[in-house]
């Protein structure tokens, strides 16, 4: 499958379910709040899973593809456990391997705004 179609399919699965099927066992995960690269599928499934559980809808605003790498600007409509809602723009950088599995993801977003949202402010 071509990389653009893979990325679109992954983001569709974030909305509809099944995104976990895209993730390789050998996975690198980076976040904007740390320079540490977390490794392993389970780490990503836990971290992304907590975030995606808040997702009401993901809209891909811009998608750039080069080889097996993707840069995406996405808008997430989130709902907190307390019922608060937030639209959050997230820059996501993905990498797929030759077997069409997602092997790396690094995300950037306004962590302060997200923390306030989660605290009900």
Would you name each region that the model predicts?
Residues 1-16:
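Short, aromatic-enriched amphipathic alpha-helices that serve as compact interaction elements
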Residues 16-68:
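A solvent-exposed, acidic/Ser-Thr-rich amphipathic alpha-helical stretch
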Residues 53, 78-87:
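Short, cysteine-centered beta-strand-loop-beta hairpins and adjacent loop/turn segments enriched
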Residues 56-59, 86-92:
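Short, surface-exposed coil-to-beta transition loops
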Residues 67-76, 88:
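A short hydrophobic beta-strand element
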Residues 83-85, 113-119:
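A short, polar/proline- and glycine-enriched secondary-structure boundary/capping micro-motif
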Residues 93-116:
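Short beta-strand edge/turn micro-motifs at domain boundaries
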């Amino acid at each position: 499958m071509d990389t653009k179609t893979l990325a679109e399919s992954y983001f569709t699965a974030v909305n509809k379910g099944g995104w976990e099927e895209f993730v390789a066992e050998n996975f690198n995960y980076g976040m904007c709040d740390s320079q540490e690269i977390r490794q392993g599928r389970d780490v990503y499934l836990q971290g992304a899973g907590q975030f995606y559980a808040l997702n009401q809808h993901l809209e891909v605003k811009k998608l750039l593809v080069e080889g097996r790498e993707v840069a995406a600007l996405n808008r997430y409509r989130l709902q907190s456990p307390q019922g608060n809602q937030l639209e959050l723009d997230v820059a996501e950088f993905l990498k797929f391997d030759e077997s069409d599995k997602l092997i790396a993801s690094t995300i950037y977003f306004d962590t302060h705004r997200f923390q306030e949202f989660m605290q009900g402010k």
